[in-house]
């Protein structure tokens, strides 16, 4: 059975969100191989997690302070992957939740499709109140949307950018060998990563089951704070930059 590490990047304590995130991981039908909370130097956050009752996850959970001092999302994920010991990893943003079948689905699909380097979930997008907004990533299962049904390819990514990799399950070796996430990509790091994988002919597959609930455009999130400061021209700049960045595996 595949070993899947769950990484939770968290830079500050927002108790009302983080409890839901942790409990959703505790409720997995298949227990993750390990759970890593990658934290900042926020004392309140680290004290809270240190006292949390992780229940059935207690023996596999570690709280790791990011010693680099870089707490942006990409750096937190990269640090967590470097510290992980599983063959595969996934991540959950601390204000999101995963469905009880997510790790189970991951294990089953890794066993069935060992050639795939990146598995994406179908993402259930909600607002801050939990109200449904839309699904993301499900379009690759529509007839003639992509070159192969269920797979995300380069030609499709050139035409469509709005895919979400939250909750993706990735082969750790593939991730590290190909440069991880780029911290210099402030807005389109999701798109750049998927595009880079496709250019390197690393298979990307969407698991055709709901796996991840994402709180979209939450007030106070790092992504929304940054996005609110840019205009249309800068947004276009980041998309074009993502299309050029795949030539390089490191910043």
Please provide the spans of the model-predicted regions.
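Conserved donor NDP-sugar-binding/catalytic core segment of glycosyltransferases
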Residues: 101-135
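Catalytic beta-strand/loop signature of glycosyltransferases that borders the donor
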Residues: 122, 204-211
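Catalytic core of nucleotide-sugar-dependent glycosyltransferases
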Residues: 210, 214-217, 223-250
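Acidic donor-binding loop at a coil-to-helix junction in glycosyltransferase catalytic cores
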Residues: 186-193
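A recurrent flexible, glycine/aromatic-enriched loop bordering the glycosyltransferase active site
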Residues: 148-170
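Glycine-rich, basic loop-to-helix element that forms the pyrophosphate-binding segment
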Residues: 67-84
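Short aromatic/hydrophobic "clamp" motif used to bind/position activated sugar donors
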Residues: 89
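Short, acidic, metal-binding catalytic loop of nucleotide-sugar glycosyltransferases
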Residues: 23-32
């Amino acid at each position: 059975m595949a070993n899947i590490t769950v990484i939770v990047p968290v830079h500050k304590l927002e108790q009302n969100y983080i409890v839901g995130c942790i409990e959703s991981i505790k409720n997995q039908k298949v227990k993750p191989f390990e759970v890593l909370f990658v934290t900042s130097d926020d004392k309140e956050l680290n004290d809270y997690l240190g006292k949390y009752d992780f229940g059935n996850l207690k023996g596999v959970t570690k709280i790791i302070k990011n010693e680099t001092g870089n707490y942006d999302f990409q750096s937190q994920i990269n640090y967590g992957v470097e510290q992980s010991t599983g063959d595969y990893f996934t991540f959950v943003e601390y204000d999101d939740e995963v469905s009880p079948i997510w790790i189970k689905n991951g294990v089953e699909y890794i066993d069935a499709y060992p050639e795939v380097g990146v598995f994406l979930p179908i993402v259930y997008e909600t607002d801050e109140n939990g109200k449904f907004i839309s699904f993301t990533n499900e379009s690759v299962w529509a007839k003639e949307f992509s070159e192969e049904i269920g797979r995300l390819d380069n030609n499709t990514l050139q035409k469509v950018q709005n895919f979400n990799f939250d909750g993706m399950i990735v082969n750790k070796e593939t991730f590290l060998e190909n440069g991880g996430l780029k911290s210099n990509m402030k807005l389109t790091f999701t798109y750049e990563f998927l595009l880079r994988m496709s250019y390197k002919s690393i298979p990307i597959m969407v698991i055709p089951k709901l796996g991840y609930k994402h709180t979209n455009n939450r007030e106070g999130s790092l992504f929304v704070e940054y996005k609110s400061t840019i205009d249309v021209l800068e947004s276009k700049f980041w998309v074009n930059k993502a299309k050029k960045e795949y030539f390089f595996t490191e910043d």
